[in-house]
Amino acid sequence: MASINLFLFAFLLLLSHASASTVIFYNKCKHPVWPGIQPSAGQNLLAGGGFKLPANKAHSLQLPPLWSGRFWGRHGCTFDRSGRGHCATGDCGGSLSCNGAGGEPPATLAEITLGPELDFYDVSLVDGYNLAMSIMPVKGSGQCSYAGCVSDLNQMCPVGLQVRSRNGKRVVACKSACSAFNSPQYCCTGLFGNPQSCKPTAYSKIFKVACPKAYSYAYDDPTSIATCSKANYIVTFCPHHRH
C-alpha cells in the first residue's frame, strides 16, 4: 500500500493489465479519514483492516481474486502510539487496525464482490450515514456505472435519526430507521423479511431522494447495485460531484 498522487495512479490503472483488481482510497474531505476494511467470511484481511488517510491523499491496495468485503470511512479519530483510541463515527472497537471488525453504525458503506466474470458493488445507507462516499470502476467492461452518495445527509437528517457531536452542536452521523427504532418494518425482518412486504418508508425515501445511486433500505436492489467486469476501483470519501 502506497501513498500516491491520484491522477498519476489513475493513469497507471489505465495501463494495467494485471488479473487482480486494485482499489484506490481517495480522501477529498477537508479532514483526515480512517478507512475501515472488513472482509467477508473466509476472505483475506487487507491492510490490517484500517489505516489513516490524510485530506487530499490517496492510497492503493491490491484486492485478491474473488475477494469480497466492505469499506467505510471513520472520522474524528484519535489513536495512541499502540493504535488504540476512538472515532466519533464508524469506530471498530477502538482500534486503528480494525482487524476484521466492522464499523459501528451509523456508517456509509461501500461493498464489493469480485467474481470470475462479473464484479458487483454498491454504496449502502442501510447501516446509516456518516460521510459522503462513492465507488467508481476504472478500465472495466460492461455497464460499470457509478455508485454512491454525494449529498450531505447530516444536513437533512430527521431529528429522530441524528447522532450529535459530544458538545451537541452539530450532527456527525444519521442513523438508519432500523437502528433508531428497531422495528421489523424498518429492519425488513420477521413478517417484513422479503421484498414483497418490506417497502420504502418515509425515512428511506429521504435517503433515496438525496442519494439515488445508493441503497436506502435492505431490498433497494434494482437501482442500487452495479456491475462491471475486470475493473479497478476508486473509492472516494467526500466526492464533490457525480461521475
Curated annotation (Swiss-Prot):
Q: Which PROSITE patterns match?
A: THAUMATIN_1, THAUMATIN_2
Q: List the disulfide bonds.
A: C29-C238, C77-C87, C92-C98, C144-C228, C149-C211, C157-C174, C178-C187, C188-C198
For the keyword Protein biosynthesis, the answer is no
A Pfam family for this UniProt protein? Thaumatin
Q: Gene3D superfamilies annotated for this entry?
A: Thaumatin
Q: Which UniProt keywords apply?
A: Disulfide bond, Signal
The record's section on SUPFAM superfamilies has: Osmotin, thaumatin-like protein
| Family classification | Belongs to the thaumatin family.
Name the UniProt record assigns to this protein:
Thaumatin-like protein
What is the organism field in this record?
Answer: Arabidopsis thaliana
Taxonomy, top ranks, is: Eukaryota, Viridiplantae, Streptophyta, Embryophyta, Tracheophyta
